[in-house]
Curated annotation (Swiss-Prot):
The keyword Ribosomal protein applies. This is Small ribosomal subunit protein uS9. GO terms for biological process: translation. The gene is rpsI. Gene3D superfamilies: 3.30.230.10.
Amino acid sequence: MADNQYYGTGRRKSATARVFAKVGSGDIVINKRSLQDYFSRPTARMVVMQALELVDMTGKLDLYITVAGGGITGQAGAIRHGITRALMQYDESLRPTLRKAGFVTRDARRVERKKVGLHKARKRPQYSKR
C-alpha cells in the first residue's frame, strides 16, 4: 500500500465498509458509483459526510469505498465508521474531536432475535384475562 493512502474498516449492524483515503479533491466513490448515485436518501448521505464535515476535510481527501451487507442505514453507518478510522490514520490529532462526536466507537446494537411463543423479539400475543 502506498504511503499516502490511508485505510479504515467500518462496521454497523451486518454491513462492512472498507475505506481507502488519499489526499485529493474530495471525490467519494462507493462501489464504483458516486455518493449521490449510491445513496438516494439524503439522511444516508448526511451520515456518510458527518465525520468529514466535523474535521473540515470535505474537499481535501478522495475516498474509495467498498461496502457490503446490510441495508441503507447500516451501510451509511459502516462507511462513517470506516471514514473515521481512515481519518485517524491520516492524522491522530483528530481522534479526540471524533471521539467526542461518538464516531470512533463502533455501534454494537444488533437486531434482537425472535423468541419462541412471541410474535417478534418482544411483541407478545394479546393477553385475555377471561
